UniProtKB/Swiss-Prot annotation:
PANTHER family: UPF0291 PROTEIN CBO2609/CLC_2481 (PTHR37300), UPF0291 PROTEIN YNZC (PTHR37300:SF1). The keyword Ligase does not apply. This is UPF0291 protein LBUL_1264. It is found in: Cytoplasm. Coiled coil: none annotated. One of its GO terms (cellular component) is cytoplasm. Signal peptide: none annotated. It holds the Pfam family DUF896. Belongs to the UPF0291 family. It comes from the Bacteria. It comes from Lactobacillus delbrueckii subsp. bulgaricus (strain ATCC BAA-365 / Lb-18). Keywords: Cytoplasm.
Length: 78
């Protein structure tokens, strides 16, 4: 199980507990921190996907914007 899976699992556990009986202050603080971590991981993964994206037109020609190509060259993706 990856770290992201563990974070997601713990968030879900805290959500269920909150629905059933409520959370203590410590648990609420943990939930907020886990949520921040989850969002940061999601954004990083999404940015990585966008950075590695190549856009191709109907004829198969690479029409990726120059700015995206520059980022890809810096990260040695091209």
């Amino acid at each position: 199980m990856t770290e992201a899976d563990q974070v997601r699992k713990r968030i879900n556990e805290l959500y269920k507990k909150k629905q059933e009986s409520g959370l203590t202050e410590v648990e609420e603080a943990e939930r907020k921190e886990l949520h921040k971590q989850f969002i940061a991981n999601f954004r990083a993964g999404f940015k990585q996907q966008l950075d590695s994206l190549v856009i191709v037109d109907d004829q198969g020609k690479d029409v990726t914007p120059d700015k995206a190509k520059q980022i890809q060259k810096k990260k040695v993706l091209r």
